[in-house]
């Protein structure tokens, strides 16, 4: 099976160690060889990254060095898959726009903080096939997104929170897949804290998305 590299850190409010552990257990159960660390240095090790089949970054905000960013991006462009969730992948390294290009989106805001909202399945792709629309009680991410992403699920804003009424009716991608060079990239905005993965649909979408992104 594949070699999976999960690295966690950054803002602790997103429970990076716990959520990384959930992902590690999930992928280990699928037979993958999973390595978990809390440093970014291995991204700069070209020989190491060349044998990684899936990288899962769990780093809200924080900063990444030039060599580490270049190593990560080169690996994905060369065929290493990349998958992640919420701010751990799409609110990382805010000064690094090429990283954001690889991800396919960037967190902007979450009006109202923790709110009730619906996730709507938007594709018959195997990552979401057979999953019905479902409810979340968490942060509803408003994002800037790459229009070339293949959108798998969406959510619609009601414009009820924080006086941001002009977003009422906006349909926002929740999960997508894309390519970056030869690498497959999957992202889901679900997963603010570890208990968000107690929602079976949210966890299953993440499981399938990670498995899809692993280099064949």
Residue ranges and their predicted role:
Residues 2-3, 29-30, 166-172, 179-216:
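Extracellular ligand-binding/catalytic regions of CAZymes and related secreted enzymes
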Residues 18, 22, 71, 126, ...:
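Extracytoplasmic/secreted proteins, especially bacterial periplasmic and envelope-associated proteins
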Residues 8-11, 191:
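Residue-level signal for short, function-critical loop segments
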């Amino acid at each position: 099976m594949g070699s999976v590299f999960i690295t966690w850190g950054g803002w602790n409010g997103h429970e990076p160690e716990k959520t990384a552990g959930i992902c590690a257990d999930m992928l280990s159960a699928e037979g993958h060889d999973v390595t978990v660390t809390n440093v970014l240095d291995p991204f700069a090790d070209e020989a190491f990254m060349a044998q990684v089949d899936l990288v899962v970054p769990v780093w809200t905000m924080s900063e990444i060095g030039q060599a580490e960013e270049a190593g990560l991006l080169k690996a994905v462009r060369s065929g290493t898959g990349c998958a992640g969730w919420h701010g751990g992948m799409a609110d990382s390294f805010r000064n690094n726009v090429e990283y954001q290009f690889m991800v396919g989106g960037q967190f902007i805001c979450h009006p109202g903080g923790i709110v009730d909202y619906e996730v709507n399945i938007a594709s018959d792709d195997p990552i979401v096939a057979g999953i019905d629309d479902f409810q979340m009680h968490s942060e509803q991410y408003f994002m800037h997104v790459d229009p070339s992403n293949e959108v798998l699920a969406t959510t619609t804003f009601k414009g009820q929170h924080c006086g941001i009424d002009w977003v009422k009716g906006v349909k926002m991608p929740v999960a997508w897949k894309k390519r970056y060079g030869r690498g497959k990239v999957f992202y889901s905005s679900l997963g603010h804290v570890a208990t968000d993965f107690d929602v079976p649909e949210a966890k299953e979408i993440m499981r399938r998305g990670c498995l899809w992104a692993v280099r064949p």
